[in-house]
Regions:
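Carbohydrate-binding surfaces of carbohydrate-active enzymes
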Residues: 181-195, 199, 206-215, 220-221, ...
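Aromatic-lined substrate-binding rim segments of carbohydrate-active enzymes
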Residues: 81-158, 237-243
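Bacterial Sec-dependent N-terminal signal peptides
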Residues: 1-14
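Aromatic- and glycine-enriched glycan-recognition loops and surfaces
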Residues: 72-90, 111-132, 232-233, 543-552, ...
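Aromatic- and acidic-residue-enriched carbohydrate-binding clefts of CAZyme catalytic domains
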Residues: 60, 99, 104-120, 148-179, ...
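N-terminal carbohydrate-binding accessory modules
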Residues: 14-95, 129
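Substrate-binding/catalytic cleft of secreted carbohydrate-active enzymes
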Residues: 35-40, 140, 144-183, 189-340, ...
Length: 732
């Protein structure tokens, strides 16, 4: 196992844009079956296979409550997919949802939009096939923008090299600019050709497959394009989807321009509600539902992302340590969605994962556990138990509740913090929703209506349904949760790792010249590992190095630059949002140049698109100046290759003669560890984690794989090592 660490003390914060979720413009509105549908049935290519009305999703002529789990195949090692699918199936889910990141599937730059030689869609095809094998419906979300706390929001690093000199708008990504649309078609063509054979409409009746195809993502976040241009963009994306034989319903999320379109390809499109309300469910989730009902009359309520946890960011708290993410919240928010009439819910995330290598967005932790029901390491937890109980409820009652009407009911409650809402099915069955958002105590009491009285007992922040069949005098409380899982008491041995050696990273022996104004991605290097730079500057002068500074990109911290002259590091002289300055040693009166070696650390590519992100899209230093004059640069990108090689038992390259000065203080160090894992007891499984205390930032490599980044600032100190990458019973 190898750690490549630059010993720096840094800080980091990533501020997520919550503007869409916190929009306060919605009017109060209650849907009770009185709206007229605006859906033209012709929008459904195969209404006999899949369609929807204002209350329910219908598959092969039957109402189906879509109980969906977000599972990112690109965040879980492929040999472990089957384990996660099995747990989803056992958890009662009937659907799985995934983003499809463009940059994951096309890692090298094609020559033109017609060049498909750099695309590799096999992993997506394998994932869709496995979902079908487990009997799950699938929702696909190919962006092109996916957010997902993923590098570049899913856009390839090379995409900005395709941006024309003149564009329709200052910001290019997610615009209807003609050249950008050509590249969108390039991507969608590949996705559609992969997805099309897996659609439900291409399967025999009774089989599962892809049921929804989402175009774009969270488009309300984009405020810098006119609404007419945004709508045109969505229309053209939808036309591309249909052109390449996607015939299941098209959906969107957080996209006003797709709401209530009376004709054309967007007619009938459901714009889904995404909500992460934590403890304030009725206030925050309820407001978004009201907005959806007001702006999408006659459309079903579907949640594209309902809170199943939350991300962790560098310098913040790990997911399970955050407030408002307890499993009881999952039950409460689900029952509130049912109370409001939802017919489809996708929980983001349900399967936790890992931001392997450098794929995480700017300053995101390596772990993407998300406090999900199925953890990053594959274990299940109390949230999973809640989902199992909710799944049984939805299987028996989900579509009946969705088609039930809200009846006005006057009631008194002995506990003023407990509220009641009644939905009544067409056959007279009653569903009394009993909820509280008070979370400091248990709630015991009695509710009395004009014709019925019952006692309740709720946990803190509890929610239950009292189900009263038509004509019955007594009912049942739902959901019924399964017993907690009994776990083996066998524990894995803790293995204390002793470093085999600490090695200074040898300076590169080969350097590549950069043209003025170019970045290393212009040479086809798209990774964001450490980069060495070299230049020659007049001694005694002030060196200015251009890089992303503190809070320049969505409040994140600065990229780091370590500068060395004559084998010694230089302290930072001063810095601002755009540059960091170093005082070069020597007498400026003597006209002599010194060699300057720099190590650059990128904090990653942000997952939001906006002009400032596009302006700083390139990988590496923006410039190096001295006395106002821009200096020529050479670079070497060696750390990633060395890490993979060393972790497989290789050696650092031998020193060879080079004109570069050897460093007394290395800019980058390697820490090598080896260990033997014992065989696991028969019938017992446990995951392995690396617990790491360290200074500086770096990358973790093991057995030829890059696990991800390690950040001095934390909060992550334990790193899940996929068992399929470990040599169980042997040396690692």
């Amino acid at each position: 196992m190898l750690l490549g660490i630059t010993p720096l003390f840094i800080s980091a914060q990533n501020i997520t844009d919550m503007a869409v979720m916190n929009d306060r413009t919605a009017d109060a509105f209650i849907e009770n079956g009185t709206q007229i549908s605006s859906i033209d049935d012709s929008v459904f290519v195969h209404p006999d296979r899949i369609c929807y009305d204002r209350r329910c999703i219908r598959i092969e002529g039957k109402d189906v409550f879509v109980f969906s789990a977000a599972f990112h195949y690109f965040r879980v090692a492929q040999p472990l997919w089957a384990d996660r699918f099995r747990k989803l199936k056992e958890g009662g889910f009937n659907c799985v949802e995934t983003y499809i990141p463009w940059n994951w599937h096309e890692r090298r730059m094609p020559r033109s939009p017609q060049d498909e030689s750099c695309l590799d869609m096999k992993e997506l095809d394998d994932f869709l096939k496995m979902a079908e094998d487990f009997g799950l419906y699938v929702i696909v979300r190919p962006g092109p923008y996916i957010c997902a706390e993923w590098s570049g929001g899913g856009f390839p690093q090379w995409i900005m090299q395709k941006k024309p000199a003149k564009t329709a708008f200052d910001t290019w990504l997610q615009s209807n600019d003609p050249e950008f649309m050509r590249w969108n078609e390039h991507w969608y063509r590949a996705v559609c050709r992969t997805v099309a054979p897996h659609q439900l409409t291409r399967k025999e009746k009774g089989c599962t497959g892809v049921i929804f195809f989402q175009v774009e993502n969270e488009f309300n976040r984009i405020k810098w394009f006119p609404k007419e241009a945004k709508k045109d963009y969505l229309i053209r994306l939808s036309q591309i989807v249909r052109k390449y034989e996607i015939d299941v319903p098209v959906i969107t999320c957080w996209t006003d321009e797709a709401r209530n379109v009376e004709e054309g390809v967007l007619n009938g499109v459901v714009d889904m509600v995404n909500s992460y309300p934590r403890w304030e469910i009725e206030k925050n989730f309820g407001r978004l539902i009201n907005q959806q009902l007001r702006t999408q009359p006659g459309k079903p309520l579907i949640s594209g992302e309902l809170q199943g946890g939350w991300m962790s960011e560098v310098g913040g708290k790990l997911s399970w340590e955050q407030d408002g993410l307890m499993p009881v919240q999952t039950q409460n928010i689900t029952l509130y969605a049912l109370q409001r009439g939802f017919c489809g819910i996708n929980y983001y995330m349900t399967v936790g994962g890992t931001n392997f290598d450098d794929w995480g967005a700017r300053q995101m932790t390596t772990t993407y556990d998300y406090a999900a029901a199925i953890a990053e390491n594959g274990s299940t937890n109390e949230r999973y138990r809640r989902f199992r109980g909710l799944a049984h409820l939805l299987k028996e009652h989900g579509t009946r509740i969705a088609r039930a009407d809200v009846l006005p009911v006057e009631y008194t409650s002995t506990d003023p913090d407990v509220k009641l809402v009644l939905r009544q099915a067409s056959n007279g069955d009653r569903y009394y929703f009993v909820r509280t958002e008070e979370r400091t105590r248990h709630h015991f009491g009695t509710i009395q209506t004009s014709d019925f009285t019952f006692d309740f007992a709720l946990e803190p922040f509890g929610a239950m349904i009292y189900y009263l069949p038509a004509g019955a005098e007594q009912g049942d409380w739902l959901p019924e949760l399964p017993d907690a899982e009994t776990r083996p008491t066998v524990k894995a041995d803790t293995i204390r790792l002793i470093p085999d050696k600490r090695m200074a990273d040898p300076l590169p022996t080969r350097w590549v010249k950069l043209k003025k104004g170019e970045y290393i991605d212009h040479d086809g290097i798209y990774g964001r590992h450490f980069v060495y730079y070299r230049t020659y500057a007049p001694q005694g002068k002030l060196l200015e190095v251009g890089r992303i500074g503190h809070k320049l990109i969505n409040g994140t911290d600065a990229d780091e630059v370590v500068v060395s002259v004559q084998g010694k590091r230089l302290p930072v002289f001063k810095e601002d949002a755009y540059s960091v300055f170093y005082q070069l040693p020597g007498d400026s009166a003597i006209n002599r140049k010194v060699e300057v070696v720099m190590l650059f650390e990128s904090k990653g590519l942000h997952h939001h698109t906006k002009k400032i992100v596009e302006d700083y899209w390139g990988i590496g230093l923006n410039y190096v100046r001295c006395g106002g004059k821009e200096l020529s640069l050479e670079y070497a990108y060696t750390e990633n290759e060395r890490g993979l090689n060393l972790s497989k038992g290789g050696r650092l390259q031998e020193k060879t003669p080079t004109e570069t000065t050897e460093l007394n203080e290395p800019l980058l160090s390697w820490y090598s560890y080896s260990f033997t894992l014992p065989e696991q007891p028969r019938g017992v499984w446990f995951p392995y984690h690396l617990r790491l205390e360290h200074s500086g930032n770096g990358f973790i490599y093991i057995n030829g794989h890059c696990i991800g980044r390690c950040w001095q600032k934390g909060p992550q100190r334990e790193y899940y090592i996929p068992e399929c990458w470990l040599n169980i019973g042997g040396e690692n």
